[in-house]
């Protein structure tokens, strides 16, 4: 089967936003107008095409990014709908890694919200070009220019409107196109009756002012246009479009458009903007990778002629076909039934069938080309972030980095029958989601699951019940504390057992010191003159790594420290790797008294939105939870409080906020960083963990 759409006419885009800004509805409408759905599903009725898991339909939020493909004006648009809820950041991170461009959806009443900032940061990390769609223009309190202002203030992004709304709230009935200098008026709410008209008289002045600002902003990034602009020459529509496209694809400029997906206004113009301004796979830099044997860096161009390479970015378990591996093809061509190499794991895999996904229905295809996104059936060993490539031309593409879980709960099956099923369920779920971990606690024998937040773990337990029929009891959430050292010291660890027969002997001197935040554990060998033989040195490092898993104060993992092996001694007969491992862990225990160990706790960036009259109560409540208020602002007729609060103090906050504001307050939180626990709290944690 020949290629249906050329690479230049392919767009791989993500739709990203804060929860409830209306992303899924926007995606639905795109599928409706591109002829993929015959009836529109509403999220708030639980009938949306993209939200296909039962819990998504019940909760009205998107959890897994469904990948789907649509066609518009001779172009193929592959869309990944990403979740906006903070607990699912990994889904967003995964999608952004394989996209070429994104549409950031904002709520016209709130503008940029905390999760928008997180997602925006992730997109900046991966260098993803973006268009901003200010949605919900029909909502009470909708304010387009306020929303644009929040993009400048909170994201420090060079964003400029390329459209202006005509009216707002109930009066929102048209859109001014600043590039083409015309207006589109909507005759009905189905979005089918659109008239292209001249800009209404009363809006002309504003339109001229903003078109001037737009040209100036684009000209600043384009020398030729700048010369024309300064000489007062007319800049044509084509030149302006080309200028916007160039600046957008190089991530220096973000066009802002408006509409109301729910009321079917502005969606077709959004699709036009995706085609006009977001990059094709040819416009983005070629993907970089390394050769497995030499670690030499290589590039794979987006072309069918290059050897095949692809990145697996999501694993899903499908009730009918089993394990689905979603992948993005960066170069070359892949036929179903062929063999590929998983270069990350060094395994050979057979691609049984290739499916093109459409929210939750699928169509089987025989070939995928460079730039395509599809799902493969039959891959056994491939997990998220693995590279698939041609067996004759190996390459490992840059993988993705995922955050560590911040919250854990103990979970136990209700019956013996559930016990076995639970193991299978947990391993399948952790295969799908790299930020979800499950392990057995060595001391208590309990199964512990860990994730990115309470909602994340709720949904995992819920999926165990629905998809794997496992009933389980869940304990109270536990915070993922960490420990670290604040002072440097040189300590000794000596393990000697020499009572007849073969003994054990290991002896080390280790210098511990604090490391930079986020750098983790670093081990250095500074032994001179072989006082500790070379073959035992890895054992010292391994012994320390093992010992660091259970910290010295309260048994939490120790992070961000440096250890240098500086001296020691050995015995010709009695020394062994095991003895040096034990000596190293003894040195770590000895460091407690000298290195000033402290406990660290996860701090959450919290944003609370409340009516003015509850301000005092909420501020008091935040402070009582050891929170630091970092800023306040008015947003429409509500107040927004931004604060840093320890995760341990945020359990049950939703209930307390509801009762403090009679259900009128909302909040969202995002993990930010680890911080030292105050002395009094630290003592309590130590007591609790020692069972006192």
Curated annotation (Swiss-Prot):
Kindly state one GO CC term assigned in the UniProt record. cytoplasm
* InterPro entries found in the cross-reference section: EFG_II, EFG_III, EFG_III/V, EFG_IV, EFG_V, EFG_V-like, EFTu-like_2, G_TR_CS
> What would be an example GO MF term here?
GTPase activity
Which intervals hold domain tr-type G?
Answer: 8-282
What GO terms describe the biological role, i.e. biological process, of this protein?
ribosome disassembly
Keyword field contains ATP-binding: no
Q: Which UniProt keywords apply?
A: Cytoplasm, Elongation factor, GTP-binding, Nucleotide-binding, Protein biosynthesis
Nucleotide-binding in keyword set = yes
Compartment annotation:
Cytoplasm
Q: Where does GTP bind?
A: 17-24, 81-85, 135-138
Stored PANTHER family:
RIBOSOME-RELEASING FACTOR 2, MITOCHONDRIAL, TRANSLATION ELONGATION FACTOR G-RELATED
Spell out the family assignment given in the record's similarity comment. Answer: Belongs to the TRAFAC class translation factor GTPase superfamily. Classic translation factor GTPase family. EF-G/EF-2 subfamily.
The protein's role, per its UniProt record: Catalyzes the GTP-dependent ribosomal translocation step during translation elongation. During this step, the ribosome changes from the pre-translocational (PRE) to the post-translocational (POST) state as the newly formed A-site-bound peptidyl-tRNA and P-site-bound deacylated tRNA move to the P and E sites, respectively. Catalyzes the coordinated movement of the two tRNA molecules, the mRNA and conformational changes in the ribosome.
Q: What is this protein called?
A: Elongation factor G
Gene name, per UniProt, is fusA
């Amino acid at each position: 089967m020949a290629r249906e759409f050329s690479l230049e006419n392919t767009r791989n885009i993500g739709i990203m936003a804060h929860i409830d800004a209306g992303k899924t509805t926007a995606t639905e409408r795109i599928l409706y107008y591109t002829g993929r759905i015959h009836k529109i599903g509403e999220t708030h009725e639980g009938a949306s095409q993209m939200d296909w898991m039962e819990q998504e339909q019940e909760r009205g939020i998107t959890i897994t990014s469904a990948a789907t493909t649509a066609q518009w004006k001779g172009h193929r648009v592959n869309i990944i709908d990403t979740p906006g809820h903070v607990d699912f950041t990994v889904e967003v991170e995964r999608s952004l890694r394989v996209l070429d461009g994104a549409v950031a959806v904002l709520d016209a009443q709130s503008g940029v919200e905390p999760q928008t900032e997180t997602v925006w940061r992730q997109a900046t990390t991966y260098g993803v070009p973006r268009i901003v769609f200010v949605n919900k223009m029909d909502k009470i309190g909708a304010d387009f220019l306020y929303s644009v202002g929040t993009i400048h203030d909170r994201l420090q992004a060079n964003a400029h409107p390329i459209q202006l709304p005509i009216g707002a709230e109930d009066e929102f009935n048209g859109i001014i196109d600043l590039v083409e200098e015309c207006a589109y008026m909507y005759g009905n709410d189905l979005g089918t009756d659109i008239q292209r008209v001249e800009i209404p008289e009363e809006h002309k002045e504003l339109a001229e002012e903003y078109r001037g600002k737009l040209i100036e902003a684009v000209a600043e990034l384009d020398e030729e246009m700048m010369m024309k602009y300064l000489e007062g020459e007319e800049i044509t529509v084509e030149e302006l479009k080309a200028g916007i496209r160039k600046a957008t694809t190089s991530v220096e400029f973000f066009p802002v458009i408006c509409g109301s997906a729910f009321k079917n206004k502005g969606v077709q113009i959004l699709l036009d903007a995706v085609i006009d301004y977001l990059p094709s796979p040819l416009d983005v830099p070629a993907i970089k990778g390394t050769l497995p044997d030499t670690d030499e860096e290589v590039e794979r161009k987006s072309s069918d002629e290059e050897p095949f390479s692809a990145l697996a970015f999501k694993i899903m378990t499908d009730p009918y076909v089993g394990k689905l591996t979603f992948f993005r093809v960066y170069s070359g061509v892949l036929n179903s039934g062929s063999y590929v190499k998983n270069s990350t794991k060094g395994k050979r895999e057979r691609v049984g069938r290739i499916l093109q996904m459409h929210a939750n229905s699928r169509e089987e295809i025989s070939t995928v080309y460079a730039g395509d996104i599809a799902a493969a059936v039959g891959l056994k060993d491939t997990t998220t972030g693995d590279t698939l490539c041609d067996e004759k031309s190996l390459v490992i593409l840059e993988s993705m980095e995922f955050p560590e879980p911040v919250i854990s709960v103990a979970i136990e099956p209700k019956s013996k029958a559930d016990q076995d099923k639970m193991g299978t369920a947990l391993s399948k779920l952790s295969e799908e989601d790299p930020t979800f971990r499950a392990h057995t606690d060595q001391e208590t024998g309990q199964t512990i699951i860990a994730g990115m937040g309470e909602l994340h773990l709720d949904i995992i337990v819920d999926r165990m019940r629905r998809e794997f029929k496992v009933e389980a009891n869940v304990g109270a959430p536990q915070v993922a504390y960490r420990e670290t050292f604040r002072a440097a010291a040189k300590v000794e660890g000596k393990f000697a057992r020499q009572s007849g027969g073969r003994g054990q002997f290991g002896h080390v001197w280790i210098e511990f010191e604090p490391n930079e935040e986020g750098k983790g554990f670093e081990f250095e060998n500074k032994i001179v003159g072989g006082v500790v033989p070379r073959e035992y040195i890895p054992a010292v490092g391994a012994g320390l790594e093992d010992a660091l898993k259970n910290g010295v104060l309260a048994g939490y993992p120790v992070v961000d420290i440096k250890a240098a092996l500086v001296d020691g001694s050995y015995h010709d007969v009695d020394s062994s790797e095991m003895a040096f491992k034990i000596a190293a862990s003894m040195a770590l225990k000895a460091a407690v008294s000298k290195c000033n160990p402290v406990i660290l706790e996860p701090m959450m960036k919290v944003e609370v939105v409340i009516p003015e009259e509850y301000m005092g109560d909420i501020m008091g409540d935040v402070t009582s939870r050891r929170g630091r208020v970092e800023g306040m602002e008015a947003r429409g007729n509500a107040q927004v409080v931004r604060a840093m609060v320890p995760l341990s103090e945020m359990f049950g906050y939703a209930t307390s906020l509801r009762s403090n504001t009679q259900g009128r307050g909302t909040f969202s939180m995002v993990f930010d960083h680890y911080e030292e626990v105050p002395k009094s709290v630290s003592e309590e944690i130590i007591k609790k963990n020692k069972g006192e």
